[in-house]
């Protein structure tokens, strides 16, 4: 069974009606979009624990050109893909969208060049790393710190990347020492952490660009 969820633009997308899925609220999505602004144009976006894909849909409407969404529940992943495709059809045919049904940790361990990512086959020579990562696991899942480490050690990100964590204001996750807190916002029971790589730690090759 599915409900409806309205994007900032007014477009409605499908939303799974189950206890395991907690859609990011309109207020929080709008805050993220306002903070990131024009940085989203032409950017790449990795959506972790994607759910309905609402946040990725918002990013798509603001200029993101490549999205990879990871969702562990098969039916929810199907809904996510449908939503992203529906939104992309109203924008531009040059957008690359991919939704993969997989468990978060096991997938991140494979790194961005793994064979399951179709983009790597379709776009040889392009940088597989991501400009933005949105991490929104169930608040009580404990799935915050290990993904932070894997994003760095498995080279999912660039020196200039931003990781946005949505979490509970009542139970803030620990920030891995490979990241630095750039910005923190509170919206009722929800908090947003905007993290950037700690460049003092040697997670990046010398050849890695800041762009």
Residues covered by each model-derived region:
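Class I S-adenosyl-L-methionine-dependent methyltransferase catalytic core
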Residues: 1-211
């Amino acid at each position: 069974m599915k409900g409806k969820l309205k994007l900032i633009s007014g477009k409605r997308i499908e939303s799974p009606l189950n206890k395991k899925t907690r859609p990011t609220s309109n207020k929080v999505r709008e805050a993220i979009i306002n903070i990131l602004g024009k940085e989203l144009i032409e950017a790449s976006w990795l959506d972790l624990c994607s759910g309905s894909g609402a946040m990725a849909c918002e990013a798509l409407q603001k200029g993101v050109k490549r999205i990879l969404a990871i969702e562990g529940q098969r039916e929810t992943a199907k809904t996510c893909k449908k939503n992203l495709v529906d939104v992309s059809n109203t924008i531009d045919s040059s957008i690359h969208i991919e939704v993969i049904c997989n468990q978060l940790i096991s997938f991140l361990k494979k790194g961005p060049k793994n064979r399951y990512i179709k983009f790597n086959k379709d776009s040889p020579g392009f940088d597989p790393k991501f400009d933005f990562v949105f991490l929104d696991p169930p608040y009580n899942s404990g799935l915050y710190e290990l993904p932070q480490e894997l994003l760095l050690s498995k080279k999912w990100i660039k020196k200039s990347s931003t990781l946005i964590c949505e979490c509970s204001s009542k139970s803030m996750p620990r920030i891995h020492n490979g990241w630095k807190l750039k910005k923190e916002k509170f919206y009722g029971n929800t908090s947003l952490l905007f993290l950037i790589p700690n460049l003092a730690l040697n997670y990046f090759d010398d050849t890695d660009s800041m762009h």
